[in-house]
Amino acid sequence: MLLGIITLFPDMFNAITRYGVVGRSVRKGGLVIKIWNPRDFTYDQYHKVDDRPYGGGVGMIMMIQPLKRAINQAKNDLGCDAKVIYLSPQGKRLCQKYVYDLAYNNQALILVCGRYQGIDERLIKMEIDEEWSIGDYVLSGGELASMVLIDAMARVLPGTLKNRNSQKSDSFFENKLDCPYYTRPKIYEGMQVPSVLLSGNHRDINKWRLKYALGNTWIKRPDLLKKIQLTQEEQLLLTEFKNEYLSG
C-alpha cells in the first residue's frame, strides 16, 4: 500500500513507522510511506506556510500555495490517481468499515495534516477528495489523526499481524465489541479467571467469548447491535447474558 503524508512535522511519524504493527508493515514492504513538508515548497526566505484569515478572527490559516505544490509532488511520485484525504473535525466519522475500504481500494492515499486554525478552503475544493474525522473533538493538528488512520489500516493489511485471525476478535469486527481477556495469575485479590477459560474446551471457550462480546456490546455500545442481524445462537447467548447480568 502506497501512502503519502503532507505535514509540517515529518519527525512525528517516527513514533509509528519505527515501532509496533505499523513498523512491521513498513519493514515488510506492505506499507510504503513517503512524507512531504509544505515548507519545502515555499519560495520566500522564511518558508512561510500560514497567514492571517481574511475577514479577521483568531488564529492563522495554512496557505494554499505550499500545500498545493506538496500535493502535486506527492501525486507525481505516487500516481496522479492517488486519493487525497484531509484529516479534519468536519469530516465523516471514521469507523472500521471505512478503514477496510481505504486499505483495500488498491489506490494510493495522500493524507493532508492541517495545522493552526485550518487550511484555505480553496484547497479543499480543488484538491481534497474526502474529509475524515476520528471523533468529535479538536486536536492541535492532523498528524495524530493521521497516525490513528495509518495504524488502523496497517493492522488489516496482509502480513502485518502475526496471527491473521486476531483481527476477527477485534472490537468493531462485524459491529461487535471484543470479549474480556485474562492472563496469569488465576486469582488476583480474590478475583478469579472464569473457569471456562481454564477448561481447555475450545468449543465452550469460543461460545463464552461470543456471549461476552455480545454482552459487552449490549452494555457499552447498544447502537452497534442495531446494525447487525443476530443469528439464532447469538440471540440465545445475548439473552442468557442479559438474564445473568440483570440478576446480578
Swiss-Prot record:
Its main location: cytoplasm. One of its GO terms (cellular component) is cytosol. Keywords: Cytoplasm, Methyltransferase, S-adenosyl-L-methionine, Transferase, tRNA processing. It is an enzyme of class 2 (transferase). One of its GO terms (molecular function) is tRNA (guanine(37)-N1)-methyltransferase activity. Pfam families: tRNA_m1G_MT. S-adenosyl-L-methionine binds at G114, I134, G135, D136, Y137, V138, L139. It catalyses: guanosine(37) in tRNA + S-adenosyl-L-methionine = N(1)-methylguanosine(37) in tRNA + S-adenosyl-L-homocysteine + H(+). InterPro entries: Alpha/beta_knot_MTases, tRNA_m1G_MeTrfase_C_sf, tRNA_m1G_MeTrfase_TrmD, tRNA_m1G_MTases_N, tRNA_MeTrfase_TRMD/TRM10. SUPFAM superfamilies: alpha/beta knot. Specifically methylates guanosine-37 in various tRNAs. Belongs to the RNA methyltransferase TrmD family. NCBIfam families: PRK00026.1 (NF000648), trmD (TIGR00088). HAMAP family: TrmD (MF_00605). Homodimer. This is tRNA (guanine-N(1)-)-methyltransferase. It comes from Blochmanniella floridana. The gene is trmD.
